[in-house]
Amino acid sequence: MTKVQYFTACTLDGYIADDRNSLDWLYEVPHGEEDSFWDDWFPTVGGLVMGATTYEWMLEHGGPDSWRKYYGERPGWIFTHRELPPILDVDIAFVQGDVLPVYEQAANRLGGANLWLVGGGDLVGQFHDAGLLDEIIVGMTPVTLGAGAPLLPRRITSKQLAFREAELIGQRIRIVLGVKR
């Protein structure tokens, strides 16, 4: 069964991007090179979902080749209410509306591989509201922004969340939480 996972980095005060939708703060923090989590986790991902702002940031900062560099040949579903530039020869669908039909399409296509919710937080919240979010994986950094795009702009209580793992890696703490559907 396809597992829906929100994997992102956030600041100590719970933001995934600053008030200009920038991730520059993230690259100032040393990455724990000794961490093998990504190498173990990423092969389980069959496809990606992201919002328009995340997609635009990726294009602006990495160019069209960044999709293949970061995600390989994995298909993507980009939620948007505006026209966005496609990336040639990359399997991307621009979608809008309810997350359930997109999840069903992705799950059927991925054949049991996991679906990575790249962001943003409100889109992830919509997956949660639809009962589709299975896991949250956060790399928390020792940075505060004071404002910006929140990690998950929803009230989700401990009745629905359970800590599974926490690990200090360099200057980051990785937290894995299970989400009850």
Where would I find each of the regions flagged by the language model?
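Enzymes that bind and transform nitrogen-containing heteroaromatic metabolites
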Residues: 1-181
